[in-house]
Amino acid sequence: MSDTPPDRPVVLVHGLGGSAAETWQSNGWMDLIADAGRPVLGIDLLGHGTAPKPHDPEAYAALHQHVLDALPDEPVDAIGFSLGARTLLECAIEAPHRFARLVLTGVGANLFEEREDHHRIAEAIAGNADPTDPFSRYFTDLAQNPDGDADALRALLQRPGERLDPAQLDVVSMPVLVLLGDADFAGPADPLVEALPNATFRELRRCDHFATPRSMQCIDEALAFVDAAPF
């Protein structure tokens, strides 16, 4: 029998260019968690969805604070994808007592390294991408989404700040599940898993970065880890 309090909230944080509705609701996560009897909260990152969308990069300097401010008072189980996973890590570094368990999807060594991928994403959001490159075209399409705000996304990508340092993760001592696709450009997962004191890693089979939120393996592994599987 589970010892997870049935009223412990499950918090979901999406990636760049997404929203709680697009990433979690449309892929069934929120309904599954609710069917398991757990409270569920999808948080829109600053610059996305229903959140404010400032155009000043300085407004995004403490992106994680917007998430911390939206959290319930009690400790939560939290699941993040890509930028949402990084933001949850920053929250857990500052306030580890706010989290009982974390699931980090779509992140790995990219959290600690400056990569060409980051430049390609920024160029795509700015409208300067190679139209024949599927990777860049994905982010160009995000910027052109009529429900989004391309200027806000550009400001977010220009925000001040530095890459995470693995040593910062020493305080993230709660159980953490890292889920990364075998074809995800964010990998490998090893540097992230090794930096976390209490981490488990599961590789998502035949899964790239963009398919992660709709991967049935990802959904099953994540919900089982936070004890929010409906059956």
Language model feature labels by segment:
Residues 25, 39-76:
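Active-site loop/oxyanion-hole signature of alpha/beta-hydrolase fold enzymes
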Residues 140-167:
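Hydrophobic, aromatic-rich cap/lid helix
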Residues 183-191:
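Conserved alpha/beta-hydrolase "acid-adjacent" motif
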Residues 207-219:
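Catalytic histidine-centered segment of alpha/beta-hydrolase-like enzymes
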